[in-house]
Amino acid sequence: MRAIVHALKYEGRRSLAVPLAMLMRERGADLLDGAHAAVPVPLHPSRRRARGFNQAADLAKHLGLPISPALRRVRATEAQAGLPAARRHGNVRGAFVATRAAAQFRGRTILLVDDVSTTGATLEACARALKEEGIREVRALTAARVPTGGGPG
């Protein structure tokens, strides 16, 4: 799984988003059920330009939910993959804000989508921004989960 996610994210093999999303749909069916939209974890604009795409958005497109740009990354951060667990929460604190698009989901359930979760720091920061906007329930679905202490990812 690690090699597939790496190829999608760092080698630009975007076609891998389709089979990964299919696996996510199977394993996360309970999370998809009742969700009103999928919200990909946004990249900072500078990182998006450098990579050329957002892998979380590519995954979200194939989950069968409407996609919402309900989050914006307002601060560039260090890559989480290069940081020890103890620094990850501080690295992304305040990095995300809800957009106007989030308002239509007040009192509803949305699904955050990302490629990898290690400590959950990024997902927690995103969920916090959405909850502050009045989103009732924020669920999260990732293609891969790296056990804490399992190395970068």
Model-derived features: positions:
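Conserved PRPP/pyrophosphate-binding segment of the phosphoribosyltransferase/PRPP-pathway fold
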Residues: 1-112, 119-153
